[in-house]
Design a protein with these regions (language model features):
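Short, small-residue-biased leader/transition segments that mark boundaries at the very start
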Residues: 1-3
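Helix-loop junctions at the membrane interface of multi-pass solute transporters
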Residues: 41-47, 51-64, 71-75
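Alpha-helical transmembrane segments
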Residues: 57, 138-158, 207-221
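Membrane-interface alpha-helices at helix entry/exit sites of multi-pass transporters
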Residues: 61-77, 155-164
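Membrane-interface interhelical connector segments
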Residues: 92-120
Length: 226
């Protein structure tokens, strides 16, 4: 139904730009909200971290610009599509107004009350999604970090093998840590990754612009097949 969805979007916008939010921003809460929002956004879509290009670089393609354009869609789908749908489900079901709910509990409540399924089945669907998301995230970041270590060590696989055991140990330790500690560690390491990568992005921006313009010019001239 378009009407409730429009109302949900209106609620989100009003909450962000209400006089209360603006007044709070004047005393610093706006900066805190921005900090948390940017940190969680980066955690969600990895924009600016330089991690996704590690996987994209493994693709076999004659056109690196095309591969870059394909990789860019990941950020759009993850943030604009998936996160928006999740946010709408939370607002439409009123989960965000329920006291005592935190983290995944809010999403669980939204799924249980939003999906046309029994509550137990809805919770199971969400749990199944979380299992797959967590598992693929573990595999993905292991691949990223192994490629980085392999590059830094000059291809010495003995270091990579030791790192794999450390990584596996960290996976088992993680669930026993507090949520705030996990977020703090994630934010610190994301910042450590983003800083050198942003410097590289600015340094190579001229090359990126040149290659992108050249790609689209050749595409307009019919030199590149769709």
């Amino acid at each position: 139904d378009a009407l409730p969805i429009s109302a949900a979007f209106a609620t989100i916008v009003k909450a962000a730009f209400s006089p209360k939010a603006i007044t709070g921003g004047a005393v610093g809460s706006f900066l805190v909200a921005m900090q948390k929002g940017v940190a969680r956004g980066i955690f969600s879509n990895e924009a600016g971290l330089g991690s996704a290009p590690i996987a994209a670089a493994a693709a076999q393609t004659k056109e690196p610009v095309r591969q870059g354009l394909v990789s860019m869609t990941g950020t759009f789908i993850d943030t604009i599509v998936i996160c928006t749908l999740t946010g709408l489900s939370i607002v439409l079901t009123g989960a965000w107004q329920v006291d005592g709910l935190e983290g995944v509990q809010v999403t669980t409540y939204a799924f249980q009350n939003g999906l046309p399924l029994p509550k137990e089945l809805s919770a199971f669907v969400l749990m199944l999604c979380l299992v797959f998301f967590a598992f693929t995230t573990i595999l993905g970041w292991d691949y990223y970090s192994e490629r980085c270590l392999e590059y830094l060590s000059g291809g010495r696989m003995k270091y990579v093998k030791v790192y794999r055991w450390i990584y596996i140990l960290a996976v088992f330790i993680g669930p026993y840590m507090t949520v705030s500690a996990v977020w703090t560690i994630a934010d610190i390491f994301n910042g450590l990754m983003a800083l050198p990568n942003m410097i590289a992005l600015f340094a190579l921006s001229g090359v990126v612009v040149k290659e992108t313009r050249h790609f689209f010019e050749r595409h307009r001239n019919g030199e590149i097949e769709d």
